[in-house]
Design a protein with these regions (language model features):
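Divalent-cation
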Residues: 1-86
Length: 86
């Protein structure tokens, strides 16, 4: 049986939050909708199957655990590089 598509959305406001939060997550149709909303809003999308498995275990609107900081920092670095191309 093929695995279902999974997706998560992160938010980080360094002035208000200590760490990034998982603000949306899901699989199947929910994942497709998360990706569609990101695309419609011109938000960068990074595929990382290992990280999505870990993020899918984080409760909604909760900060990512410290053990995931490095992996999540790499995602935000990717976003920064993608959105700040000149």
């Amino acid at each position: 049986m093929p695995s279902r598509k999974k997706a998560a959305a992160l938010r980080y406001n360094e002035e208000k939050e200590n760490a990034p939060k998982v603000v949306a997550k899901g699989e199947g149709e929910v994942a497709k909708n998360i990706i569609k909303i990101a695309e419609l809003n011109n938000l960068p999308i990074k595929k990382d199957e290992d990280l999505i498995e870990l993020l899918s275990k984080v409760e909604l609107d909760k900060e990512v655990p410290e053990a995931l900081y490095k992996a999540v920092a790499e995602v935000f670095s990717f976003i920064y590089r993608t959105t700040n191309k000149s």
